[in-house]
Amino acid sequence: MAEIIQERIEDRLPELEQLERIGLFSHAEIKAIIKKASDLEYKIQRRTLFKEDFINYVQYEINLLELIQRRRTRIGYSFKKDEIENSIVHRVQGVFQRASAKWKDDVQLWLSYVAFCKKWATKTRLSKVFSAMLAIHSNKPALWIMAAKWEMEDRLSSESARQLFLRALRFHPECPKLYKEYFRMELMHAEKLRKEKEEFEKASMDVENPDYSEEILKGELAWIIYKNSVSIIKGAEFHVSLLSIAQLFDFAKDLQKEIYDDLQALHTDDPLTWDYVARRELEIESQTEEQPTTKQAKAVEVGRKEERCCAVYEEAVKTLPTEAMWKCYITFCLERFTKKSNSGFLRGKRLERTMTVFRKAHELKLLSECQYKQLSVSLLCYNFLREALEVAVAGTELFRDSGTMWQLKLQVLIESKSPDIAMLFEEAFVHLKPQVCLPLWISWAEWSEGAKSQEDTEAVFKKALLAVIGADSVTLKNKYLDWAYRSGGYKKARAVFKSLQESRPFSVDFFRKMIQFEKEQESCNMANIREYYERALREFGSADSDLWMDYMKEELNHPLGRPENCGQIYWRAMKMLQGESAEAFVAKHAMHQTGHL
């Protein structure tokens, strides 16, 4: 092995000598490169091989290549690239070949190889890398697409790209993505040929090229792919995706029309078809010769387009009265409603239309809970409180057991400054399961804090603590304690703490809050701090090493602390803490003793 490593290092010497001779690297730097290269060579030549060693080797060589480039730019020297860079690139390719042969299944390794070749190697080399990768990973359509796009865009070889797509489709005859990219590629190829022909005609050059046949220039190959693909892959979604691609190419108007007509003929029972047809009306310009120029005229024109869209949607919900179809309709209305406009006329029309469609869909009970929320939130954002409340009320009628729906309704009522909010909170709790009520209790308490007396707010917290049990009550207790300190100061917070100190479960934060409140007082009482720590350790002393450490620091740093208690606290901690917590405590204590914590 030593002989192989020595031989490979000797192979490097000519390039390293050149680097030193032309002044890109100093003698000391060359020695450092040789030492590092020896270490890397050893790791990839030993009997037990690790992928990370190959990756590190390649990364080092890439860093070296980039450094050489930067130094060349700095001194303005561009010669000897064959002896230097090309030699390094060739060596890296060899390492990649070994690694990809050993770890064939690692797609990321292959992609790194491809990325390296794109930047540093020749196009011929990259073509071979793609072939080797696809021979092993033929089951991954994305890799076929990547290779074909490279052939088309970088090598400018549409024939090679076409052959790759055809091979890929033999492996994946039902892959929509492959058909879409192949379809796009043929349209791009036709567009490129049209531009070439146009340039030749401008230059008055008579070039005979069979590729310039009228069929190819019109996108006949793309049409064949379209026909074959839709016979295999059913559904409006795929059809629409092909139409969207075709619309990117101005010359393919006939193809666009055929796809559009087929979509309407074959998929009338799919909401996506109707949705697409309706939205297409936004793109169709007015038939009048004069385009609108004033802002008002433009707003009127946009309004007309939206009316045409809605006419299609109205026909759609009559033909296909399903939840999915109504979802498309209300989503369109909501998108237009939230679209920014300076026209009061247009905003008013959009609001009116959205509410009309909502009422119809609600009456038929063909909207999901998510759509009630979406619509109500949007209306609330734009301060249409009356309409937002209408939607929220309708939503709670249908989804009485939804906590978020009730919360939304109550949020709208709070924004509207309704006098019946407390009563409506009570009503919500009648319909909801206790386990989903926590956000509503918190909302009630927050609203009460701003709108009601301190006694009323405390009554809400006390009610909530009786109703909310388990882990949810932990959050509520923390909120209650925070409110007590905000509204009544330390005295009130301590009273609340005392009243709750036996009402398990707790969180560590509950006790830490009280410790912090105590420390914020002018006459900070160390006895109280010890009490809070002791209560916290009773609950969490077997698992929380930080709590023990903080207790010891408090005794050491507080003016009224007793440093002599630290030894006893340490031994108590060692008895109570278990497993990893005990190890963590010992490590933290040692760091503290040495002044590192």
From Swiss-Prot:
Domain of life: Eukaryota
Gene Ontology cellular component list: chromosome; nucleolus; nucleoplasm; Pwp2p-containing subcomplex of 90S preribosome; small-subunit processome
Species of the source: Homo sapiens (Human)
Family: Belongs to the UTP6 family.
Subunit structure and binding partners: Part of the small subunit (SSU) processome, composed of more than 70 proteins and the RNA chaperone small nucleolar RNA (snoRNA) U3.
Ranges of the HAT repeats in the UniProt entry: 121-153, 156-188, 304-335, 488-520, 524-557
Keyword set includes ATP-binding: no
Keyword Repeat belongs to the record: yes
Listed Gene3D superfamilies: Tetratricopeptide repeat domain
Protein name, entry field: U3 small nucleolar RNA-associated protein 6 homolog
Subcellular compartments: Nucleus, Nucleolus
Gene Ontology MF term list: snoRNA binding
Keywords, ordered alphabetically: Nucleus, Repeat, rRNA processing
Single Gene Ontology BP annotation: maturation of SSU-rRNA from tricistronic rRNA transcript (SSU-rRNA, 5.8S rRNA, LSU-rRNA)
Purpose of the protein: Part of the small subunit (SSU) processome, first precursor of the small eukaryotic ribosomal subunit. During the assembly of the SSU processome in the nucleolus, many ribosome biogenesis factors, an RNA chaperone and ribosomal proteins associate with the nascent pre-rRNA and work in concert to generate RNA folding, modifications, rearrangements and cleavage as well as targeted degradation of pre-ribosomal RNA by the RNA exosome. Involved in nucleolar processing of pre-18S ribosomal RNA.
Lineage of source species: Eukaryota, Metazoa, Chordata, Craniata, Vertebrata
